């Protein structure tokens, strides 16, 4: 046996081997040690190998899904090795013959299908990543991602600078790459951020055989029947289906043909922005408190998954967004239809995942019932939607898809399945009585034999005088007679010992058998096996009917999800007083009465109101001389705790929700399409990469300044705060100028550097705004209103006092602040605004090199050490440098 184990283990390196032995999966050697630690189960030993004890642990087959889930969550992959013949067949080959075993499946994070292993509200993506190296040095990447539990299959292509954002959007559970790509130092940091990366041999990513492998998987002669793909996309797609073939071993899950996602069809959002805005998870990693949690009113698991997909990938096509908004508007206007549809959806099962399990031979009776109930829900939904006059395009398309599944299949399933269904088909009892005559006859014979056992138990109890005598059954002994230890001697003594044969002694019971009981057991076993065999045949026939109707079932499942999301957004709009946004191709960004969707709900739960605010980043009307009433960049100043960060985030979230196809938390919103969303909000270090908080901030700011186009929306909070005052002020100053002159994008910039407000005099599209506060008897009251103007102080000491700093520290801080304010730093900066030229737009590939000899001004600058200077010394040095400038 151990020789067989070692042979199978050698063929599956890097995976924990679940080796089937009877009712357990056993693990040996290092696998046992790893599993014992990960699962918290006892490590024992079994025999010896090369003179050393063999470590061993095991898990019961009936609970294996739970243990698999824990191992996968811990980052392990598992090979499941089953017995492929009956032990009796092995014995016929000889007493020392080992039962044949084979690996039937590789369980990896990206190839899960069982409900017990999956999050019902989230997709489970396997992603293949392929790279093409260009002679210009600019790499291109193709991504193919598949959820085998729902049959979704997508491909796209992107540049190296878009790769991180694309991976963050898809959020795969497992990524497969070539071993060459896995060892590439340029991608090392990015790959380490992913939850599970599996390197594969280079031939898995062989572009020359990609089309052949795809055609083979989908059983088509040419690629014409599949989506048009680039050669690189086909390479990634072929790698993905090849890996699925290898892990599913003989079970090829049906997949939808790959759908190609065009570049630029969705809003690009980098990983830092996703984290900062807490779209699907809070910074603490929790779903609760995220935007997804706040807006999710879906009734089905499939609807929740689709909502998460849409939230991760807002559209950039106005027509597609309008179609989504039209569906939401129709269900917002018709409250009765919305409520009725949501009530029907509450009963709709997860048809796509049920179908996937049936296709892979892992389904059960409840999956068949799910398909039956899904078709019934489709009929109910169609009947309710028929009352809509002129349904919008999105709802009409969903109605058409709901007509697809076979009603004959639903009727057959309704006739076949019983009321109370077991989880596993091997348990039997799922076919309705009267559906199949042969099955009914086998069941009667089986059940009548069981009545004979009950009568035999009563007779044995009477004959022995042991009223507590029981006839029981287990998989090891079969049927047996059981008595307590105090009555055992009676059965082991004459004359009863001629009838009762001793089989087993336990702590409190003794077990016996009889020749009569053995005969009855054989009859029951034969009848039971025949009944179960007939049921399993019926199950396979019904599953085959469902699989043949697979495309129609999957389309209907997607239609349910689309209706669920539309009805969810409609419910959200009514509950939270959201309004339909106007989306167009302009550069407008005009929000009236905007609110933060998450914070508003949190305040509502405590009975507090949320203060709504306007924001207009639309281009000012010509001429653009002066700041006008609005500008493309808002410079926001105000105290700590006043709500600046909330204001920044709420406008980003409003834009995102609008392009997802949701109504938005505002009284009015007009938004020109945003192609990229950038957020630099919050502070965190990255110790694993040796980055300080300030370094992380600068890296993220660099990405924004290098990539933001005029169609981007940028929100920046407290740029420059992590370094010396003048350094930070200078960086913030230059960043604003770059956004204004080079990126020319819509932006919100919050700062405590009040000196920067003077820039609005020179930058015509920079608009000053401030968060209003009120002082009352020495206390600061935060009004959370955003108004035109500039703050002259941050009230940091008042906030520090509210936080509980000792009174002595507060008093000293006030004294120091008074002396610093007496130096009137702000007026000096305003002089600089007048003296310094505007930001000069340079090539993004680098700055021009200085020419000529070093000037006295440069030498003087080199001699300065800003970190060692007091504010007064720095100011004096600045005047001295100004005096060295050539006279004009």
Swiss-Prot record:
Name recorded for this polypeptide: DNA mismatch repair protein MutS
GO molecular function list: ATP binding; ATP-dependent DNA damage sensor activity; damaged DNA binding; mismatched DNA binding
Region: Disordered, residue numbers: 249-271
GO biological processes: mismatch repair
Residues reported in the UniProt entry to bind ATP: 638-645
Lineage: Bacteria, Pseudomonadati, Pseudomonadota, Alphaproteobacteria, Hyphomicrobiales
InterPro entries, per the entry: DNA_mismatch_repair_MutS, DNA_mismatch_repair_MutS-lik_N, DNA_mismatch_repair_MutS/MSH, DNA_mismatch_repair_MutS_C, DNA_mismatch_repair_MutS_clamp, DNA_mismatch_repair_MutS_core, DNA_mismatch_repair_MutS_N, DNA_mismatch_repair_MutS_sf
Organism of provenance: Nitrobacter winogradskyi (strain ATCC 25391 / DSM 10237 / CIP 104748 / NCIMB 11846 / Nb-255)
Superkingdom to which the source organism belongs: Bacteria
Keywords from the named record: ATP-binding, DNA damage, DNA repair, DNA-binding, Nucleotide-binding
Function: This protein is involved in the repair of mismatches in DNA. It is possible that it carries out the mismatch recognition step. This protein has a weak ATPase activity.
GO cellular component: cytosol
Pfam families: MutS_I, MutS_II, MutS_III, MutS_IV, MutS_V
Similarity comment text for this entry: Belongs to the DNA mismatch repair MutS family.
């Amino acid at each position: 046996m151990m020789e067989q184990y070692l042979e199978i283990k050698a063929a599956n390196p890097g995976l924990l081997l679940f080796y089937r032995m009877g009712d357990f999966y056993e693990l040996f050697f290092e696998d046992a040690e790893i599993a014992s630690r990960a699962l918290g189960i006892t490590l024992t030993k079994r025999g010896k190998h090369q003179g050393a004890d063999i470590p061993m642990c095991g898990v019961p087959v009936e609970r294996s899904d739970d243990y698999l889930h824990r191992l996968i969550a811990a980052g392990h992959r598992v090979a499941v090795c089953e017995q492929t013949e009956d032990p009796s067949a092995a014995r016929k080959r000889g007493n020392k013959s080992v039962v044949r075993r084979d690996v039937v499946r590789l369980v990896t994070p990206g190839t899960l299908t069982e409900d017990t292993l999956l999050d019902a509200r989230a997709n489970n993506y396997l992603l293949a990543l392929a790279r093409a190296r260009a002679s210009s040095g600019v790499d291109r990447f193709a991504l193919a991602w598949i959820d085998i539990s729902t049959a979704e299959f997508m491909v796209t292509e992107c540049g190296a600078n878009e790769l991180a954002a694309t991976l963050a959007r898809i959020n795969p559970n497992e990524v497969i790459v070539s071993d060459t790509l896995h060892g590439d130092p340029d991608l090392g940091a990015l790959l380490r951020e992913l939850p599970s990366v599996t390197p594969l041999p280079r031939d898995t990513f062989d572009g020359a055989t990609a089309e052949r492998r795809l055609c083979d998987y989908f059983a088509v002669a040419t690629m014409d029947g599949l989506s048009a793909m680039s050669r690189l996309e086909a390479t990634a797609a072929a790698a993905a289906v090849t890996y699925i073939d290898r892990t599913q071993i003989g079970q090829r899950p049906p997949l939808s043909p790959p759908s190609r996602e065009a570049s630029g069809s969705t809003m690009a959002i980098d990983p830092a922005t996703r984290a900062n805005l807490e779209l699907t998870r809070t910074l603490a990693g929790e779903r609760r408190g995220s935007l997804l949690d706040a807006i999710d009113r879906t009734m089905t698991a499939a609807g929740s998954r689709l909502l998460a997909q849409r939230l991760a990938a807002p559209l950039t096509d106005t027509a597609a967004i309008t179609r989504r908004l039209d569906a939401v508007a129709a269900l917002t206007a018709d409250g009765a239809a919305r409520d009725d549809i949501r009530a029907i959806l509450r009963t709709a099962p997860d048809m796509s995942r049920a179908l996937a399990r049936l296709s892979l031979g892992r389904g059960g009776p409840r999956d068949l019932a799910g398909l039956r109930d899904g078709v019934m829900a489709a009929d109910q939904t169609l009947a309710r939607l028929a009352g809509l006059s002129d349904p919008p395009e999105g709802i009409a398309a969903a109605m058409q898809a709901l007509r697809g599944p076979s009603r004959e299949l639903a009727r057959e399933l309704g006739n076949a399945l019983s009321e109370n269904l077991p989880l596993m088909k091997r348990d039997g009892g799922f076919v309705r009585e009267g559906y199949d005559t042969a099955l009914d006859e086998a069941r009667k014979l089986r059940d009548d034999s069981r009545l004979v056992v009950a009568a035999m138990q009563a007779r044995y109890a009477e004959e022995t005088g042991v009223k507590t005598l029981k006839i029981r059954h287990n998989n090891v002994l079969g049927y047996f007679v059981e008595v307590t230890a105090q009555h055992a001697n009676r059965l082991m003594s004459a004359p009863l010992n001629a009838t009762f044969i001793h089989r087993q002694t336990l702590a409190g019971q003794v077990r016996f058998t009889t020749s009569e009981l053995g005969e009855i057991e054989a009859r029951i076993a034969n009848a039971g096996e025949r009944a179960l065999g007939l049921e399993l045949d019926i199950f396979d026939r019904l599953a085959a009917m469902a699989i043949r109707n697979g495309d129609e079932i999957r389309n209907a499942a997607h239609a349910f999800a689309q209706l669920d999301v539309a009805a969810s957004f409609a419910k959200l709009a009514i509950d939270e007083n959201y309004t339909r946004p106007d989306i167009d191709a302009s550069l407008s960004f005009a929000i009236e009465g905007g609110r933060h969707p998450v914070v508003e709900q949190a305040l509502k739960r405590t009975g507090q109101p949320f203060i709504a605010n306007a924001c207009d980043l639309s281009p000012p009307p010509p001429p653009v001389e002066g700041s006008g009433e609005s500008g493309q960049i808002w410079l926001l100043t105000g105290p700590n705790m006043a709500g600046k960060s909330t204001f920044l985030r709420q406008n980003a979230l409003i834009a995102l929700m609008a392009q997802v196809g949701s109504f938005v938390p505002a009284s009015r919103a007009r938004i020109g399409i945003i192609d990229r969303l950038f957020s630099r909000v919050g502070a965190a270090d990255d110790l694993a990469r040796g980055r300080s908080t300030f370094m992380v901030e600068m890296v993220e700011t660099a990405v924004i300044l290098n990539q933001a186009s005029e169609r981007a929306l940028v929100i920046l909070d407290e740029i420059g705060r992590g370094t010396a005052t003048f350094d930070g002020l200078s960086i913030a100053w230059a960043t604003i100028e770059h956004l204004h002159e080079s990126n020319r994008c819509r932006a919100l910039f919050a700062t405590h550097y009040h000196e920067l407000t003077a820039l609005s005099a020179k930058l015509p599209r920079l608009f000053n705004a401030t968060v209003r506060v009120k002082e009352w008897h020495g206390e600061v009251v935060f009004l959370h209103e955003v108004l035109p103007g500039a703050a002259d102080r941050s009230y940091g000491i008042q906030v520090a006092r509210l936080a509980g700093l000792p009174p002595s520290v507060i008093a000293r801080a006030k004294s120091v602040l008074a002396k610093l304010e007496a130096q009137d730093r702000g007026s000096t900066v305003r002089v600089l605004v007048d003296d310094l030229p505007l930001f000069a737009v340079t090539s993004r590939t680098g700055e021009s090199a200085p020419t000529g000899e070093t000037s006295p001004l440069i030498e003087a600058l080199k001699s300065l050490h800003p970190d060692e200077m007091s504010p007064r010394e720095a100011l004096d040095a600045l005047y001295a440098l100004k005096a060295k400038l050539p006279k004009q």
